UniProtKB/Swiss-Prot annotation:
Keywords: Electron transport, FAD, Flavoprotein, Transport
Cofactor(s) this protein cannot do without: FAD; AMP
Keyword Electron transport: yes
Family annotation (SMART domains): ETF
Species of origin: Mycobacterium tuberculosis (strain ATCC 25618 / H37Rv)
Highest taxon, organism lineage: Bacteria
Protein name from the UniProt record: Electron transfer flavoprotein subunit beta
Length: 266
């Protein structure tokens, strides 16, 4: 039996305009459309494929999704449940606002401790809002579990998990004994679309809501005021302007060189 927990995150849609709040420079999550991060959809898909493969062999398992976020994150949870996840855990506490990656990893590790029988934790390699790529490794460190990160292929057999990681140097095969933490990249699979039946079923699936107190995390261990880093200032990205057009009437090459020199590119 493989009981899998998938870490998911609701993020601003990459097609929406993303803004920082004026006061503390944290991401203004209400200013943009919110979606389940695409890499998390792939993580959920991988968990479902593992569960389905084992079910075909007569092995029972479950898939639980875990997220930390405000009330709005329920939308991401329902998307994962409609894909086929069995249940969800939602860490919802205002004290998490502004937490850095270390604090977030700590809180998620504590929340994982409330889910019994977890043998595998699957995460995306990095979120599209923070792009830190550190949370899976941080959680593995806190839990004292082996970690296999940035995987493009995964298989489980005999209480061991094997994965492939592709780098500029080549493709490496990694192996660990369960329980373990893994992260997957965009090459791992193509996520399924929720069916109408799945969408309706998701409304009835169990969602456990937890607070920081319920997972044994003190208020001074998380949050903006206790973060290990502070953003002191933020400057909006300049609006795009039309580029300089060069009409080649025999001097095009010289004009391009002059432009590059003026821009201190060459």
């Amino acid at each position: 039996m493989t009981n899998i927990v998938v870490l998911i995150k609701q993020v601003p849609d990459t097609w929406s305009e993303r803004k920082l709040t004026d006061g503390d420079f944290t991401l203004d999550r209400e200013a943009a459309d919110a979606v389940l991060d695409e890499i998390n959809e792939r993580a959920v898909e991988e968990a479902l494929q593992i569960r389905e493969k084992e079910a075909a062999d007569g092995i029972e398992g479950s898939v639980t999704v875990l997220t930390a976020g405000p009330e709005r994150a329920t939308e991401a949870i329902r998307k994962a449940l409609s894909m086929g996840a069995d249940k969800a855990v939602h860490l919802k506490d205002d004290g998490m606002h502004g937490s850095d990656v270390i604090q977030t990893g700590w809180a998620l590790a504590r929340a994982l401790g409330t889910i019994e029988g977890t043998e595998l934790v699957i995460a995306g390699n990095e979120s599209t809002d923070g792009v830190g790529g550190a949370v899976p490794a941080i959680i593995a460190e806190y839990l004292g579990l082996p970690q296999l990160t940035h995987l493009r292929k995964v298989s489980i057999e005999g209480g061991k998990i094997t994965g492939e990681r592709e780098t500029d140097e080549g493709v490496f095969t990694l192996e660990a004994t369960l329980p373990a933490v893994i992260s997957v990249n965009e090459k791992i699979n193509e996520p399924r679309f929720p069916s109408f039946k799945g969408i309706m079923a998701a409304k009835k699936k169990e969602v456990t809501v937890l607070t920081l107190a319920e997972i044994g995390v003190e208020s001074d261990e998380v949050g903006l005021a206790n973060a290990g880093s502070t953003v002191l200032a933020s400057t909006p990205k300049p609006a795009k302007t039309a580029g300089e057009k060069v009409t080649d009437e025999g001097e095009g090459g010289n004009q391009i060189v002059q432009y590059l020199v003026a821009q201190k590119i060459i």
